[in-house]
Amino acid sequence: MTGILCVEEEGGILFHQRRVSRDRLLIDWIMKKIGEKSLWMREYSKTLFADYPVKIAEDYLAQAGSEDYCFIEDGSYTEYLDKITGLLLCRWRRHYPSDLKFQESILAEGWQLEAVYEVKGSSHENIMVEEWKKRKASHSCCERGEQ
């Protein structure tokens, strides 16, 4: 599954249980990027995607399949890091107050930056989107060679 998170320049996601920002053109870009794949989210995020078919569930991260995308606006993703194999990290490039932050330290633990996109926004001039993939674990340390 691929998680999609929108963060301000210090990693903030929410402030007093409200998103720190939003952008209509970024939503359009996300939907073009994922194509025909399913996009899961909780009820709170549904209004952002009113023009698109999305799947709604409070346990959306548990229900999403391996090829699905999840729009994440809470801290519950940390419980599903073993299931998440990709991230689209959308950076607002502005500072907004926040009290829930994305844990950037997880990216140093087996993740690789695959691509960076510049997205022209409606309320933000440019939004940087980083595409991260989880590196596959190498089992070479455990393999036995023939003698």
Short names for language-model regions:
Residues 1-147:
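Enzymes that bind and transform nitrogen-containing heteroaromatic metabolites
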